[in-house]
């Protein structure tokens, strides 16, 4: 036979995996002694169904689709069959079932020559009225269906198919006749064949005049692996039963694929046919590339075109013997068209989400997107820490209608971090990088004017998420009075810089030092706050240049409110109210109210809670919730000593770290001192730092400005007690800058040039209202210290 190259479907009979029962396997092609009669078989060919074509109403800047219309058929090329080739029959399997008992009476295999649609075969005689099935172009399957097999089992006959370019394979077909009279001599039989596959054709045209679109990939996604020869599967395939086909990226492509009964949705607008709004297993064409509008910048873009009936927006079924033709004219990157995906996806279609997304400013692509219907990492959230007041199921979705910029830094006071923030109809926030080489921003998804959730964009020329630099940390547990001794852990991978910083390099040059500060976080909150913008010994320091969504400069000590203005409640409802307020107001810095120390609010009349959550006193409801916001917790909430905290931090929806990272546990810095019986020390002999950093300046007004400090902070050995380089080339010297913090009492940025700090995810102990953190000043190193949860400190994330 003539060799034909088929793109998409390749059925190799000898290698197929059939879904047959053990009874079907039987003795194989051994037929009992039955009388047969010659039969003249004539085969007819049922034309492929057309899905119908309707021209869609559309704007000037959208994806132009006419589904099901096949005007101006594309010329034949390698990988596409001609009409004659689609009708070709090379071999047949004939199966005869008795209508009385629906069991197999006889089977036969025959080959046909080119163009032949008739054959002289034999069928069992004396069996009364029978149903005869003809399978074409599937090889010899007679041994797969044993004598006595039921018709119901036969209809389940299926094979696995693979993508690729086959050699000499015709399309599998099936036909039947249910009233063959086996008592008639010299009978004739006519059977109409239908193809057991669907045909998908893509005709892609170029953009508007002046625009440019470069194709990087054309794929057919969610293709069923299993081909049922006889009749359709009863249900849609599972995700494990799906595969994808690729192409050579030419503008005219054809695939032949098994049917996929994906189902229907109640949709009336073609622009609503997008992921999350359609059946999860629906088959679609994915066109990926780079689009450059006239006078604009290049952007990564993808177009998702779901198959189905051409006149029904809600239909997603791919039926056998049906032709699906997609005439796609790429005409822009309209965010109001759900089929259009603009920008490089940072969230892997919603499967790799977090509250922080890292983008590399030196990449050619400046457009990005992430799934904005998922809160943080989408983790299941207990009612105890839920801002909704009820448990949030894993993967629960929000429904934004728009997006906006909350704040951004501007490099040098002018260069913007983000030039554009928008919301796409398909549930993505889309943003474009500005001209800044380094910066931080917060963007929000909203319903109307209400913020539903917000995310931190960390823009840096150093790396993207995949390239984040880490260092190995070993812990150094020891017996210390009043502390629990945890087990030692080694090789913990920790970022080599603060979250949001442009550099982790030790320096004492102002321009370089400020790059190391990163951003500040209040304990348990996901949204960052701008850090100090000076290298000086300063309290009430100026912050880096930062602007809100309206373009107004944000001043230091602004956008702050006392927690007692939200509520003075002490129950779970009060916790919910405060969490909800911070979610809806990511720019608002929450000040503590020390008046919560009184007994009426659960206090002891002496000690405030020092928390941005009102009245979070030890063992009280707000305190128990605060303990778990970042996934840290006490081993025993009633009795735990310092360091008796969970070391396996379970990332929550409030965790501020990028995907693949989480907040550190309390013991992460224990190698920073080497004293035998204490963790915290002001003795330089106990400091596990480079030699040049073994110095104390006890005057807090001088701090690290002292010339004896060669860098603006200290450099610690994360493993061992001497400088070393790991096999991967990373150093064991970690620099922690004197970046200061933002005070939870008045919102001022203090201790710049004096304090080197970093939050852990852990509460300090069962008796303390504080949380654990690294505390270093110019005259001490305290790796196991505690502080007020209303304060905002830098964060250094740990790799999962």
Which residues fall in each region the model found?
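Bacterial N-terminal signal peptides
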Residues: 8-16
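C-terminal, surface-exposed recognition/capping segments
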Residues: 501, 597-800
């Amino acid at each position: 036979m003539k060799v034909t190259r088929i793109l998409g479907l390749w059925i190799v009979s000898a290698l197929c995996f059939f879904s047959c029962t053990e009874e079907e396997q039987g003795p194989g092609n051994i037929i009992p002694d039955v009388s047969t009669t010659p039969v003249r078989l004539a085969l007819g060919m049922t034309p492929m169904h057309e899905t119908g074509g309707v021209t869609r109403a559309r704007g000037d800047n959208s994806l132009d689709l006419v589904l099901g219309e096949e005007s101006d058929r594309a010329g034949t090329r390698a990988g596409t069959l001609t009409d004659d080739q689609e009708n070709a029959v090379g071999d047949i399997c004939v199966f005869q079932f008795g209508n009385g008992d629906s069991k197999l009476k006889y089977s036969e295999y025959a080959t046909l020559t080119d163009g032949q649609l008739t054959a002289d075969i034999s069928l069992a005689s004396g069996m009364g009225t029978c149903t005869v099935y003809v399978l074409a172009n599937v090889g010899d399957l007679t041994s797969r269906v044993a004598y006595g097999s039921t018709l119901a089992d036969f209809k389940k006959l299926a094979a696995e198919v693979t993508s690729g370019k086959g050699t000499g394979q015709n399309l599998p077909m099936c036909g039947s006749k249910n009233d063959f009279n086996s008592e008639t001599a010299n009978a004739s039989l006519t059977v109409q064949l239908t193809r057991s596959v669907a045909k998908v054709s893509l005709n892609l045209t170029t953009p508007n005049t002046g625009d440019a679109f470069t194709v990087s990939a054309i794929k057919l996604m969610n293709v069923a692996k299993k081909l049922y020869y006889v009749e359709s599967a009863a249900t849609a395939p599972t995700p494990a039963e799906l595969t994808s086909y690729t192409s050579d990226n030419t503008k005219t492509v054809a695939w032949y694929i098994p049917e996929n009964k994906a189902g229907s949705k109640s949709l009336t607008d073609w622009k609503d046919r997008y992921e999350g709004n359609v059946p999860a297993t629906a088959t679609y064409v994915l066109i990926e590339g780079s689009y450059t509008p006239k006078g604009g910048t290049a952007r990564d873009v993808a177009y998702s075109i779901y198959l189905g009936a051409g006149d029904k927006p809600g239909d997603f079924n791919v039926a056998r013997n049906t032709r699906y033709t997609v005439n796609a004219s790429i005409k822009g990157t309209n965010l109001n068209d759900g089929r259009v995906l603009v920008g490089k996806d940072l969230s892997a279609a919603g499967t790799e989400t977090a509250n922080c997304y890292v983008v590399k400013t030196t990449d050619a692509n400046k457009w990005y997107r992430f799934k904005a219907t998922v809160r943080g990492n989408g983790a299941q959230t207990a009612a105890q820490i839920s801002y909704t007041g009820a448990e949030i199921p894993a993967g629960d979705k929000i429904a934004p209608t728009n997006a906006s910029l909350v704040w951004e830094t501007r490099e040098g006071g002018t260069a913007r971090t983000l030039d554009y923030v928008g919301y796409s109809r398909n549930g993505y926030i889309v943003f474009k990088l500005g001209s800044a080489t380094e910066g931080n921003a917060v963007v929000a998804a909203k319903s109307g004017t209400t913020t539903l959730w917000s995310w931190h964009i960390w823009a840096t020329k150093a790396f993207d998420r995949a390239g984040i630099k880490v260092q190995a940390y070993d812990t150094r547990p020891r017996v210390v009075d009043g502390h629990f001794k945890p087990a030692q852990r080694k090789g913990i991978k920790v970022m080599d810089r603060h979250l949001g910083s442009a550099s982790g390099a030790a320096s004492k040059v102002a321009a370089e030092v400020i790059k190391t500060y990163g951003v500040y976080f209040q304990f348990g909150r996901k949204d960052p706050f701008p850090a100090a913008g000076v290298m000086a010994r300063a309290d009430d320091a100026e912050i880096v240049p930062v602007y809100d969504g309206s373009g107004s400069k944000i001043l230091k000590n602004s956008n702050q409110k006392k927690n007692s203005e939200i509520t003075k409640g002490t129950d779970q409802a009060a916790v919910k109210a405060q969490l909800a307020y911070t979610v809806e107001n990511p720019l608002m810095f929450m000040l503590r109210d020390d008046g919560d120390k009184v007994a009426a609010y659960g206090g002891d009349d002496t000690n405030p809670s020092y928390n941005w959550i009102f009245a979070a006193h030890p063992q009280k409801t707000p305190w128990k919730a605060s303990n778990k916001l970042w996934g840290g917790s006490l081993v025993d909430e009633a009795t735990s000593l310092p360091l008796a905290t969970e070391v396996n931090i379970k990332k929550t929806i409030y965790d501020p770290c990028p995907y693949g990272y989480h907040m550190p546990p309390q013991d992460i810095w224990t190698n920073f001192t080497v004293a035998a019986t204490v963790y915290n020390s002001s003795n330089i002999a106990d400091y596990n730092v480079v030699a040049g950093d073994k110095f104390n300046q006890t005057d807090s007004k001088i701090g690290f400005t002292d010339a004896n400090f060669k860098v603006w902070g200290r450099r610690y050995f994360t493993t061992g007690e001497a400088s070393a380089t790991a096999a991967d080339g990373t150093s064991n010297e970690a620099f922690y800058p004197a970046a200061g913090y933002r005070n939870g009492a008045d919102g001022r940025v203090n201790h710049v040039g004096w304090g080197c700090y970093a939050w852990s995810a852990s509460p300090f102990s069962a008796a303390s209202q504080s949380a654990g953190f690294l505390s270093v000043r110019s005259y001490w190193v305290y790796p196991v210290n505690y502080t007020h949860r209303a304060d905002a400190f830098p964060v250094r994330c740990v790799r999962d």
